[in-house]
């Protein structure tokens, strides 16, 4: 909601959001779909699993994003509904840092599949699909009026759409 409000107020030209977000009447352009996955070290007991529910991992030591991040806020809401908090051992400011800690065996963590793929070849990581429908996140670009954007902003939108369209085909 904070990103959409910044676009609506004119503080930024473009906002990128994922999941269920009130777009506040702004123009929205779908540009990609990403999935949240469970990341574990390759030695973890869940590493060989294909799918897992979020509730199953709540007894595990966890690595999370910083408390104010959109993802950690969302996961906090999910755990509140489940009535059981995550056992967070450390909270970090980037998915790459999370993957390093997870690969080192500090705990398990929820990361976007795109971040997981970026780090899989160079880190000791396994990724397991989450069974919950909320784990699939649609991503949108928000603007007040896309046609009125400066050329550099339009170029950024074009690049994002082309990049993710090519990535989806591979």
Can you describe what each PLM-predicted range is?
Residues 12-18, 93, 110-112, 116:
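Short beta-strand and adjacent tight-turn residues that come in two discontinuous sequence segments
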Residues 1-5, 91-98:
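Short helix-initiation/N-cap motifs at beta->coil->alpha
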Residues 19-20, 42, 113-115, 139:
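Short secondary-structure boundary segments
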Residues 1-36, 40, 77, 103-106, ...:
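Short beta-strand-centered segments that line the small-molecule binding cleft or hinge
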């Amino acid at each position: 909601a904070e990103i959409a409000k910044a676009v609506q107020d004119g503080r930024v030209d473009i906002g990128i959001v994922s999941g269920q977000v009130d777009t506040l009447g702004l123009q929205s352009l779908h540009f990609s779909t990403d999935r949240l996955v469970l990341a574990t070290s390759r030695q973890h007991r869940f590493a060989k699993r294909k799918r897992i529910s979020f509730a199953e991992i709540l007894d595990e030591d966890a690595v999370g994003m910083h408390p104010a991040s959109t993802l950690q806020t969302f996961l906090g809401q999910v755990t509140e509904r489940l009535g059981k908090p995550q056992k967070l051992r450390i909270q970090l400011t980037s998915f790459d840092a999370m993957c390093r800690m997870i690969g080192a065996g500090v705990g398990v963590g929820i990361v976007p599949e795109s971040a997981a793929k970026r780090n899989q070849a160079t880190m000791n990581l396994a990724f397991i699909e989450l069974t919950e429908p909320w784990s699939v996140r649609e991503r949108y670009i928000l603007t007040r009026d896309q046609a009125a954007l400066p050329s550099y902003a339009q170029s950024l939108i074009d690049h994002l759409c082309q990049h993710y369209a090519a990535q989806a085909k591979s």
